[in-house]
Swiss-Prot record:
Region: Disordered, residue numbers: 1-20, 75-103, 150-169, 213-306
Modified residues annotated as Phosphoserine in this record: 7, 9, 11, 13, 264, 270
Family stated for the protein in its record: Belongs to the EBP2 family.
Subunit structure: Interacts with WDR46.
Acetylation found in the keyword field: yes
Main location: nucleus
Biased amino acid composition, Basic residues: 274-306
Gene name of the encoded protein: Ebna1bp2
The protein's name in its UniProt record: Probable rRNA-processing protein EBP2
Its biological purpose: Required for the processing of the 27S pre-rRNA.
Comp. bias intervals (Basic and acidic residues): 91-103, 213-224
Polar residues bias locations: 81-90
Cross-link (Glycyl lysine isopeptide (Lys-Gly) (interchain with G-Cter in SUMO2)) at residue(s): 93, 179, 218
Length: 306
């Protein structure tokens, strides 16, 4: 059975469906750019310019006199004044720190100086003048005086950095010292509080030994009799309280303090018969003289004083 040929409308719809599917696939892969355009990647071409490479090689191989080139190659140059190796010199041999301005500038200076010293004999052999004529007044980019100023400035900067580092270390040490001192003081306070609590317990009879004693001394143990006395004393007031009661009087509970007891009832040592029956040496009918003046006398004295 032969299939009927597709019409133009059917072919256009199939093309649209295919293009829509391609756009969806490109969008899912992230290849769509603004404007719904798909950027097609072009294949990279390997450039092999043989003639250009040969021309560069010919320029490298050009044999010129050294006077025309005046090139010299030197490695890292150590300081001349260094006789013994130091950790700083060993670090310089390993490599110059690009962040250190002083070290970097000094390496440039030493390398340039060594290159000049290596080239001068060869220039003298070739009879090339190396000194500036007297009528040549053009100065170089940086004179020796300017270089000396730069050197002094770099030295000052390095000294300031070292001073700042030392100050930081001192501050850190002081902070650590204060922290240690605070810990020591807190430890002493805790030990003192523990010792005072142990002494109070020992005095009140709650403990029979003192654990804070150190050294060769054995811990003091309370005997049975001492412990018994301590327990008995703990029931009543201590010596300080008894002394204050004796001096200022008992300031505690007053209710029932004047009640009679069996011991006070049987105690007749303070009984005086003459005083009880009024047979003392006092004269009857005479009372002690009243030293305070009367009301009228006080008013008269007050008016006279005005």
């Amino acid at each position: 059975m032969d299939t009927p040929p597709l019409s133009e409308s059917d072919s256009e719809s199939d093309a649209c469906l295919a293009s829509d599917q391609e756009l969806q696939d490109a969008f899912s892969r992230g290849l769509l750019k603004p404007g719904l355009n798909v950027v097609l990647e072009k294949p990279k071409k390997a450039v092999n310019d043989v003639s250009g490479l040969k021309q560069c090689l010919a320029e490298f191989r050009r044999d010129l006199e050294w006077v025309e080139r005046l090139d010299v190659t030197l490695g890292p140059v150590p300081e001349v004044s260094e006789t013994q190796p130091t950790p700083q010199n060993q670090d310089q041999k390993k490599g110059v720190n690009p962040e250190d301005d002083f070290q970097r500038e000094m390496s440039f200076y030493r390398q340039a100086q060594a290159a000049v010293l290596a080239v001068l004999p060869r220039l003298h052999q070739l009879q090339v003048p190396t000194k500036r004529p007297t009528d040549y007044f053009a100065e170089m980019a940086k004179s020796d005086q300017q270089m000396q100023k730069i050197r002094q400035k770099l030295q000052t900067k390095q000294a300031a950095m070292e001073k700042s580092e030392k100050a930081k270390q001192l501050r850190a040490l002081r902070k650590y010292g204060k922290k240690v001192q605070t810990e020591v003081l807190q430890k002493r306070q805790r030990e003192k509080a523990h010792m005072m609590n142990a002494i109070k317990k020992y005095q009140k009879g709650f403990s029979d030994k003192l654990d804070f004693l150190e050294g060769d001394q054995k811990p003091v143990e309370r005997s049975a009799k001492a412990g018994g006395k301590g327990q008995q004393m703990s029931k009543g007031p201590n010596a300080k309280r008894r002394y204050k009661n004796q001096k200022f009087g008992f300031g505690g509970k007053k209710k029932g303090s004047k009640w009679n007891t069996k011991e006070s009832y049987d105690d007749v040592s303070s009984f005086r018969a003459k005083v009880a029956h009024g047979k003392g040496s006092r004269r009857p009918g005479k009372k002690g003289a009243n030293k305070r003046p009367g009301k009228r006398a006080r008013q008269k004295l007050k008016s006279k004083a005005r």
